[in-house]
A protein has these predicted regions:
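Conserved alpha-helical scaffold segments that buttress catalytic/binding sites
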Residues: 2-285
Length: 285
């Protein structure tokens, strides 16, 4: 049994037993390659959420109408990526075994790997839909294979070819883009192709894991992230993409790479909260 967090994300006050969705935070950023601070993301989102309404005029839904349990942040070993990933994997596995939907808050993008390990064990035919500025397909980064720069490559090690679908990608080295041509389905710069993919996944009812790196957003509206990349999408484009993916058989998700201290205005944290609210309300669980 997981215990109630003291400061929950707004509207997420269900008991664990009654909840359909379980939030769990992974405050980890030890492999950050540029600007650290993503470990403060989950707590900042919870605190900032109380400046947000529980009601979404975009979807005409309210967080008080759904059952979400916020289990707070995990205690993770900053000095060991594998140890942290094992803890995240164990938490995700518990939530899945209890028949609930796991929604992970990062933290840097490497934390996704722990959740994917657990989800793929329960759903071997799983696909990943990946929103990000960065390909994340390096074999290693400065010799480290467990890095946020390698997270989708490690996910590919688990799932194999043709089951990772990448959108908004606009940064990476030549080898990553070459790898993607034969091993993943990459859509550069925006969400072109997402509706067709979602329709096919709906038809086949394949399990889908959704991972959202918030740096898919343009830094003009979301500067508070470790590796900002010009040329990103808008909030409304991301919201419409989330609503499109919500029609598929989503079995797990994460939102990651908010580094709140890198945006003194607080706009990035407010944006992250709104993305999370809309994702929670879009899930059909």
């Amino acid at each position: 049994m997981l215990h109630q967090n003291i400061e929950t994300f707004i509207g997420c006050e269900s008991s664990y037993a009654d909840a359909d969705i379980v939030l769990y935070g992974a405050p980890f950023d030890s492999t950050t390659s540029y600007r650290p601070g993503a470990r403060f993301g989950p707590a900042a989102m919870r605190h900032e959420s109380y400046g947000l309404e529980t009601y979404s005029p975009y979807q005409d839904k309210d967080l008080t109408d759904i059952k979400v349990f916020d289990s707070g942040d995990m205690e993770l070993c900053f000095g060991s990526s594998e140890s942290a990933l094992k803890d995240i994997e164990a938490r995700a596995e518990t939530i899945l075994q209890d028949g609930k939907f796991p929604l992970l808050l990062g933290g840097e993008h490497l934390v996704t790997l722990g959740a994917v390990r657990a989800a793929a064990r329960k759903y071997p035919a799983m696909h990943i839909i990946h929103f990000d500025a960065h390909a994340g397909l390096r074999q290693d980064y400065l010799g480290a294979e467990l890095s946020h720069a390698c997270v989708l490559r490690r996910c590919h090690d688990i799932l194999g070819d043709g089951r990772i679908h990448q959108f908004c990608i606009r940064s990476g080295d030549r080898e990553e883009f070459t790898f993607a041509k034969t091993h993943t389905e990459m859509h550069k710069f925006d969400f072109s192709g997402l509706e067709a993919l979602a329709a096919e996944l709906c038809r086949t009812q394949m399990p889908v894991y959704l991972t959202i790196d918030l740096d898919c957003l343009d830094p003009s509206c979301f500067p508070g992230t470790g590796t900002p990349e010009a040329g990103g999408v808008t909030f409304m484009q991301l919201l419409n993409a989330i609503l499109t993916v919500s029609k598929t058989n989503i079995i797990g998700a994460d939102v990651n790479e908010l580094a709140p201290m890198l945006d003194a205005s607080g706009v990035s944290t407010a944006m992250a909260c709104k993305v999370l609210r809309e994702l929670l309300l879009a899930l059909n669980v």
